[in-house]
């Protein structure tokens, strides 16, 4: 199982088994990461922890453990096993971070499988009559259980409807996801499946007044942010021109090693993100670098797609091929990537959860009906908006991009800190639609940063008329850039050349969107697109209308229609079938018992 997950040269791995308990486990982790020095054991070596991801604690927690006589090792995660000794079954609800793990308690002849309360760090599982298999990447299960190498029809339907699978389902037949905030215990051959956390706990909190919320948020954010700067190596700050990374920069804690800032960008054009992020870094006295797409991104695009699909178990495909490319370059600057991602979802009600309007002609008739029905069926009406964001949208719809990042760097965001999310539930009703508390935090902690506008025209020193004009201009440019790229409706495709001429003449093309897959699929990557679609047509994969595939390729490459989403769907599922079903080696050396692989 381990070999399927050890696909980077900087990964470390190991195995651990307790045959008398029927446990055979292994782990994979990037070197010098939080989990790279496992297994974590207590002094008597009768409690063992295998871990994936990261967990954050205040210094007081470690001090308290030492005062109680525990010998904490040098490894970043060594304190966890001692916290379990002290807390027992209450251990899991004390954890703060994105993680999954397996505790083997030899004293009780008992084991616990658990994940973070949001389910961002996944555990895939499959149960047979005589064993339970689980792994943090689905490919590890497919490696040893070839009978699972088939698509789950409902999972594929959800994927084509929303770009993700929902409510514990996966792309693979017989493989499920551990529910959010779960702890499964194993004892004497029995498995007890429980949850240690429910969002209802946070939903039941009292609502604060606006003034109290603003004050509490400032105090909480400044107190919790230093956790995310703890590292044995330099921190890399993935900096944009948006509000959420600006809040981080406004409240920068003292660090032993000065962080480095960087911004992802396209080949040549300087985006607003790049220009404004550089100004933010300069105000904070930090170095800033631009990480650009290079010619090798296009010349090696097929391998970038395959690498992305493999690392994310098929949840990110051709439209995300840049993620590992950029994060690999970011790793050269720092193995830890701190971002402002998910701040909008948790604090301001931003949502990207909506159906993908794929052309019905792409799909076979039965699948087209199923996808349409699925898109109509799923709704989050009546659900608390933060519960939906933190426990549904982020671990389901937004899973793939952080997963690609985590394959290269330690991915961190303060906006999923337990204290921040819990506090967000107490915001007055109007706060999630307002940015006032965000602006007040920035102004209070680094007034100079509030004078630099965001990419959407917010903040900055200007009178009301100038500020309003800037916001209107920024939002208009952003919308035009979106239309020029993946957002161009097929019915407006005939205006493609006019839109390109307009944005070029106004010198606004690429100011917001440096990822131009729609255009790349017409030009630099046209040969790749046509080759893959013809290959799929030859194999006649059952999902598609084979007669439409060649037509789709021609229509897109010539610029007559925008089929960028359809191309991505076909390319991604083709790569899943090829990499994870047909070409994935089979591993005969496995035990039919409780088996785990972590990475």
What role is predicted for each listed range?
Residues 1-296, 304-305, 571, 577-579, ...:
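Cysteine-centered catalytic environments shared across enzyme families
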Residues 10-12, 18-19, 174-179, 319, ...:
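Adenosyl-5′-phosphate
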Residues 93-95, 243-244, 272, 317-322, ...:
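Short, glycine/acidic-rich beta->alpha junctions
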Residues 218-225, 320-327, 331:
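Short, hydrophobic/amphipathic alpha-helical packing segments
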Residues 230-232, 330-335:
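Glycine-rich phosphate-binding loop signature in dinucleotide/nucleotide-binding domains
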Residues 235-237, 336-339:
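Short glycine-rich phosphate-binding loop at a beta-alpha junction
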Residues 244, 342-343:
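Catalytic metal-binding/acid-base residues of hydrolase active sites
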Residues 266-327, 344-362, 378-381, 408-409, ...:
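ATP-dependent adenylate-handling ligase core
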